[in-house]
Swiss-Prot record:
Signal peptide feature range: none
Catalytic activity, EC: 6.1.1.15
Domain-level remarks: Consists of three domains: the N-terminal catalytic domain, the editing domain and the C-terminal anticodon-binding domain.
Its job: Catalyzes the attachment of proline to tRNA(Pro) in a two-step reaction: proline is first activated by ATP to form Pro-AMP and then transferred to the acceptor end of tRNA(Pro). As ProRS can inadvertently accommodate and process non-cognate amino acids such as alanine and cysteine, to avoid such errors it has two additional distinct editing activities against alanine. One activity is designated as 'pretransfer' editing and involves the tRNA(Pro)-independent hydrolysis of activated Ala-AMP.
Source superkingdom: Bacteria
Protein name: Proline--tRNA ligase
A biological process term (GO) from this entry: prolyl-tRNA aminoacylation
A single cellular component GO annotation: cytosol
InterPro entries for the chain: aa-tRNA-synt_IIb (IPR002314), aa-tRNA-synth_II (IPR006195), aa-tRNA-synth_II/BPL/LPL (IPR045864), Anticodon-bd (IPR004154), Anticodon-bd_dom_sf (IPR036621), Pro-tRNA-ligase_IIa (IPR002316), Pro-tRNA-synth_IIa_bac-type (IPR004500), Pro-tRNA-Synthase_IIa_type1 (IPR023717)
Keywords on record: Aminoacyl-tRNA synthetase, ATP-binding, Cytoplasm, Ligase, Nucleotide-binding, Protein biosynthesis
Complex formation: Homodimer.
Family indicated by similarity: Belongs to the class-II aminoacyl-tRNA synthetase family. ProS type 1 subfamily.
Catalytic activity of the protein: tRNA(Pro) + L-proline + ATP = L-prolyl-tRNA(Pro) + AMP + diphosphate
Length: 570
């Protein structure tokens, strides 16, 4: 490919609305252009990397025994109503009506469609197991699309769905996909962790997220210093201490805390540690008030609480509801005397003589004790873990924190969709059985963006060779010189004939301009062809990642590029 005939609209300035480095560099490198909020054009250079990831995904899916198909983006509402997700999914589901007033949605995922297809076609255990996948555009009406391809509204995704006769067989399918995902991200050249995760709106009994490690990541993940335990913060647990304070209960008393609303303010005012307070949070679960209690230095994990309550919606209550439930403004709530359901974190269970709000403005209670002063409906793990918490899986490790970008997610769905939608088969005895399912997603564009977050420097992108738009760029310093043009064309022809994806920069531009563009778009290897070095029979070969520069003969440079590509793609 010749640069002068290609479409790579690079820009030197960083766009003001691009917050993260991948968004900045993909815009500057002429890889994407914004059409609307969270909706992008994939330009030729960006599309080449997208296709590279798709091909790796397709190869590994096929290797794992999955079969490719393609489903419609437009989905009928009746399928979502049948599964129970039409209302549950919320405003991210873009709904519309056609001219006949029939309701549809733009698919953010395809569990309903694939389950409907399989229940129509699969009748016998002899047709199972089967794993079907597609690579297709999706749409989720994100409330705040941001970060370019990292959190868009329209995006490219690989989604696969496995169907099995029972849970044991479904576990085998799950493990096949888990291992396939590891191979995919290894082949893409990414540093990643597979972590335990909440199943969210997809549902099911178990899931893992594949997280690319990056400081810019939106997700917090934890891992153990001593074993292989890892989870995202929504799912992460800490080993619960059996320690109970043995102090004798003291008389409860009211103390004045004028305008001291926050945990930090109250702790400082009373000269106590934040862990000696219990915070009282009022929430609405499916619009019904519920109270959560946590140790003062801990934070509520709304996902854990939502799962415990089994509600569809959970949100912090507004001031009006807080006053109605507690009789006091926000900041002075406490559990004593409340009639609402109270869910307390496990860390509260062993506390004695703690401080809470008094359910009256500018007042708190000291020496509050469980059982004597109030009762709890349920004790459960409802907090976020913190750095240094003991690992829940081993005796010696503690938890450390990382930032990550979710690029893949695998789910054990069990019978969530097949039971709701009556997807069944006849077993060997002719009895009707419910199909067990799994689903498995990879964000294709997000994988490219995450790769850039992990692979860049001050000059631009440093693509891993397997997903780089081109393997090598030839920077011809002056194509008007016969010797430079002939040598550049010869190198280009030899590399192309060997199957190397090569971009010949034949533009009439200054050398420095060409070098900056080559660094910006992140092509792994650069051959510089100039008359000065050609006089000695040499060209310059530079590695984008290491910055190493070598003067080599044309033959040696070509062989070195071929060897590097073959090694990376084998």
């Amino acid at each position: 490919m010749r640069y002068s005939q290609y479409f790579i609209p690079t820009v030197k300035e960083t766009p003001s609305d691009a917050e993260v480095i991948s968004h900045q560099l993909m815009l500057r490198g002429g890889m994407i252009r914004k059409l609307a909020a969270g909706v992008y054009n994939y330009l030729p250079l960006g599309l080449r990397s997208i296709r590279k990831v798709e091909n790796i995904v397709r190869e590994e899916m096929n290797r794992a025994g999955a079969i490719e198909l393609l489903m419609p983006t437009v989905q009928p509402a009746e399928l979502w109503q049948e599964s129970g997700r039409w209302e549950q999914y919320g405003k991210e589901l873009l709904r519309f009506r056609d001219r006949k007033d029939t309701e549809f949605c733009l698919g953010p995922t395809h569990e309903e469609v694939i389950t409907d297809l399989v229940r129509r076609e699969v009748k016998s255990y002899r047709q199972l197991p089967i794993n079907l996948y597609q690579i297709q555009g999706k749409f989720r009406d994100e409330i705040r699309p941001r970060f370019g391809l990292m959190r868009g509204r329209e995006f490219i995704m690989k989604d696969a769905y496995s169907f099995d006769v029972d849970e044991k067989a479904a576990d085998i399918s799950y493990d096949k996909m888990y291992q396939a995902y590891r191979r995919i991200f290894e082949r893409c050249g990414l540093k990643f962790r597979a972590v335990e995760a909440d199943t969210g709106s997809i549902g099911g009994s178990w899931s893992h997220e594949f997280m690319v490690l990056a400081e810019s990541g939106e997700d917090a993940i934890v891992s153990c210093t001593a074993c292989d335990y890892a989870a995202n913060v929504e799912k992460a647990e800490a080993r619960q201490s059996a320690v109970t304070e043995h102090a004798d209960p003291r008389d409860m008393e009211k103390v004045s805390t004028p305008e001291k609303k926050s945990i930090e303010e109250v702790a400082a005012f009373l000269a106590i540690h934040e862990s000696s307070l219990v915070k009282t949070l009022v929430l609405l679960a499916d619009n019904e008030p519920v109270v959560a209690l946590l140790r003062g230095d801990h934070e509520l994990n709304e996902i854990k609480l939502k799962n415990i309550l089994g509600c569809d919606t959970l949100e912090m209550a507004g001031e009006e509801v807080v006053v109605k439930v507690t009789g006091a403004p926000t900041g002075f709530a406490g559990p004593v005397g409340l009639k609402a359901k109270i869910i307390a974190d496990l860390a509260v269970q062993g506390m004695k003589n703690f401080v809470t709000g008094a359910n009256a403005k500018d007042l708190h209670l000291k020496n509050v004790n469980l059982g004597r002063d109030f009762n709890v409906t349920t004790f459960a793990d409802i907090r976020n873990v913190v750095l240094g918490d003991p690992c829940p899986r081993c005796e010696s490790g503690t938890l450390e924190m990382w930032r990550g970008i979710e690029v893949g997610h695998v789910f054990k769905l069990g019978t969530k969709y097949s039971k709701a939608m009556k997807a069944t088969y006849l077993d060997a005895d002719g009895k009707e059985q419910i199909i067990f399912m799994g689903c498995y997603g990879i964000g294709i564009g997000r994988t490219v963006a995450a790769c850039i977050e992990q692979n860049h420097d001050e000059n631009g992108i440093i693509f891993p060779l397997p997903i780089a738009p081109f393997h090598c760029i030839i920077s011809a310093l002056n194509m008007k010189e016969d010797v430079v043009r002939e040598a550049s064309e010869a190198i280009y022809g030899q590399l192309a004939a060997a199957g190397i994806e090569v971009l010949l920069d034949d533009r009439d531009e200054r050398p420095g301009f060409k070098f900056k563009d080559a660094d910006l778009i992140g092509i792994p290897m650069r051959i510089v062809v100039g008359s000065k070095n050609l006089a000695d029979g040499k060209v310059e070969l530079k590695c984008r990642r290491s910055g190493e520069v070598e003067l080599l003969s044309i033959a040696d440079a070509v062989e070195k590029v071929k060897a590097a590509v073959n090694a990376a793609l084998k």
